């Protein structure tokens, strides 16, 4: 399988590769996305160009994107209703960009389009890294805090818990990201504690398999 990854930093993408392999239960060949993104909203800004590059210039099977939710609206089951779109939900926004960009692409390289997998780390990818180690860090805890206007922790808190600092050097950040991601060879705990953000990505990825098998 040939897959491109897009996230907010090289450290995020290093961890994302391991998490995607855990969901797919197989390794994959990396395809360069053509452009890099650094933070939100840059991911959304470069996504159309990346989709065009992957469709016309590569034989990539799919593109996986993960961004932090920060303080935005968290994706929920209600957002999965047909034709539903929440303008403040980053997962809804990214899916919308996929639809608008790809709808006029002709079939190419043996596929109709590059497959989509989108995840949202609530409120930041460091929360995923702490899954199974800190039971207080969950998607539900964050959403309940949003409802009370009293966050149970901050993104800075999460960085301190993972890195021992809120300003890790890139090399150390990548090292810790990969160490944490390797703990999730079985991703079911992540899907249970982060059912909307991680769960959405996992469901997308599991839906890739039939087409990939047909191409072999």
Regions found by a protein language model. Name each.
Residues 2, 13-34, 48-216:
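C-terminal accessory helical subdomains adjacent to catalytic cores in phosphodiester-
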Residues 35-40:
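Conserved helicase motor
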Residues 41-48:
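Structural motif
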């Amino acid at each position: 399988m040939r897959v491109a990854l897009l996230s907010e930093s090289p450290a995020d993408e290093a961890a994302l590769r391991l998490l995607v392999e855990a969901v797919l239960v197989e390794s994959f060949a990396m395809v360069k996305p053509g452009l890099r993104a650094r933070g939100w909203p840059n991911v959304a800004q470069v996504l159309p160009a990346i989709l065009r590059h992957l469709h016309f210039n590569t034989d990539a099977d799919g593109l996986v994107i993960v961004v932090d939710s920060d303080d935005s609206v968290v994706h929920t089951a209600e957002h999965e209703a047909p034709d539903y779109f929440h303008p403040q939900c980053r997962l809804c926004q990214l899916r919308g960009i996929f639809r608008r960009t790809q709808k006029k692409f002709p079939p190419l390289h043996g596929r109709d389009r590059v497959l989509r997998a989108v995840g949202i780390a609530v409120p930041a990818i460091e929360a995923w890294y702490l899954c199974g180690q800190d039971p207080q860090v969950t998607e539900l805890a964050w959403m309940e805090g949003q409802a009370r206007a009293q966050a149970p922790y901050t993104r800075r808190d999460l960085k301190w818990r993972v890195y021992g600092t809120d300003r890790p050097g890139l090399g150390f950040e990548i090292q810790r990201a990969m160490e944490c991601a390797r703990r999730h060879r079985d991703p079911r705990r992540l899907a249970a504690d982060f059912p909307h953000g991680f769960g959405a990505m996992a469901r997308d990825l599991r839906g890739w398999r039939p087409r990939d098998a047909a191409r072999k």
